[in-house]
Amino acid sequence: MPLRPGDASSSASTASNRSRTRTRYRTKAMNSEVDESLFGGVKPSSQGKSDSPIVVIHDKHAIRKTLSALGLEHKTETIQLITRDMVRELIVPTEDPSGESLIISPEEFERIKWASQVLTKEELNAREQALKKEKEGILEAVTIRKKIMKQKEMTWNNNKKLSDLEEVARERAQNLLQRADKLRMEQEEELKDMSKIILNAKCHAIRDAQILEKQQIQKELDEEERRLDHMMEIDRRESLQRQEDRERKRREERVRGKRHIVEQIKKNEEERSLQAEHREQEKEQMLAYLDRLQEEDLQDLERRHQEKLKMQAEIKRINDENQRQKAEMLAQERLADQMVMEFTKKKMAREAEYEAEQEKIRREKEKEIARLRALQEKAQDYQAEQDALRAKRNQEVADREWRRKEKENAQKKIETEEKLRKSRLEQVAFKEHTLAVQVQRDRDEFERILRAQREQIEREKQEQEKKAKGCLQHANELRRQVRENQQKHVQNRLATFEEGRRLKEEAEKRRERIEDIKKQKLEELRATGLPEKYCIEVERKANILPATSVN
């Protein structure tokens, strides 16, 4: 449907208004290039038309000029397309009426003509023979030129005295040639096997050295552990010795304290006996007075008897309370004594028996004192009883202090043993961590070496496959050459014989050269300081033999 001018102007204004609010059109390229062969060309007139649908374009510009002059130039049909943001003209594509035309260049046409020629087997063989003879002639000419150039160069070198710089350059060139020859020889299969054997021997040597180093480290760790165990044992024995010394001093102090208490008791008994004698004398002096005051004394004795009963009840209550506290303390001490060693328990048991015996003796003495106090009539009996009770309390205080110190020492010993146990666990954990790190390093190193060996084996395998393919192709070529050589003259057979002899000499020289290089590599391996057993193993695997002369 054709567009009106008004519609075009309105659409253009609308497009311009919208283009202000939207992104403007981006220019991708200032010009465009199109392959004109894609659109075809004008067909030639019926006078020059042939049966072939192929049209060869010799000169596009000349054809276009001719058609323009004759008024036969094809005019393209276009359509104007107006969109919101731009106006474009589109070319209507044309079609070939026959649908059989094909436009190609002259070069392509010549190539198709040349490829369309079908040669017979004899022509192919003749072409191959001609190409082969041409190659052989070229190679022979090149060989002759090389020989002539070498002879001229040798003559020139022999006749000319070299300068210092030229001598250095010649030595450098010879060194480069030797290096190139060495690198070329390194590509031989035997030397590759030799290098692989040497690398394997070095890997084994490194692995054995790592194993020895690991064993040495383990040995040092074991020695260090034994030394620490010995130090801990010495420390434990010294601690036990100090503990025994403290026990001995404590027992001596207890014995001295008990001896002092016994001496005080004996002294008090002597004083009481003296007082008893003195009282007897007073009794004798006061018999008259006692007779007179007998009634009063009986009342007073009854009162004192009641007081004594009360006092005995109070003493019994105090003794029961002391026994109960002592039983509780003994229970606590037994609970604490369970955490110490067995020999301490036995000592405490013996001391408990000794204390029980002393307690029994003390009770017997108290009974005796009570009996003597019952016979006495004065207040001094109560004082003696108070002295005995005070001595008993002092003994109990000393016992409690001793048990407290024992408990503190046992607690300190338990804390020391706990610290030693923690230190031991930390040492074991550190040793396990060090060993795990060393094992991980060894594993990583082994995996790296194994990965490198695998990569090298894969590369060698690929090279062997390539070489096998090359050998197969070479063998096929040799078989073809043998068949051709069988058809040649006897002179060619003689030349083949000479070539075989030369190849044999070269193979023998190559073998000798390889053997020399193997021996040189073995000497270099020995010079690196590798143990002799690995060198012998490399020599055995490489089959290094003495060089033999060529007859």
Swiss-Prot record:
Entry comment describing in which tissues the protein is expressed: Expressed in respiratory cells and in sperm (at protein level).
Effect of disrupting the coding gene: Knockout animals display left-right asymmetry abnormalities, including situs inversus totalis. Nodal cilia rotational speed is reduced compared to heterozyous littermates. Mutant males also exhibit asthenospermia and are infertile.
Compositional bias per record (Basic and acidic residues), positions renumbered to this chain: 387-415
Entry GO terms, CC: 9+0 motile cilium; axonemal B tubule inner sheath; axonemal microtubule; extracellular region; sperm flagellum
Listed PANTHER family: CILIA- AND FLAGELLA-ASSOCIATED PROTEIN 45 (PTHR15504:SF0), NASOPHARYNGEAL EPITHELIUM SPECIFIC PROTEIN 1 (PTHR15504)
Subunit structure as annotated in this protein's UniProt entry: Microtubule inner protein component of sperm flagellar doublet microtubules. Interacts with AK8; dimerization with AK8 may create a cavity at the interface of the dimer that can accommodate AMP. Interacts with CFAP52. Interacts with ENKUR. Directly interacts with DNALI1. Interacts with DNAH11. Interacts with DNAI1.
Protein's name in the database: Cilia- and flagella-associated protein 45
Organism in which the protein naturally occurs: Mus musculus (Mouse)
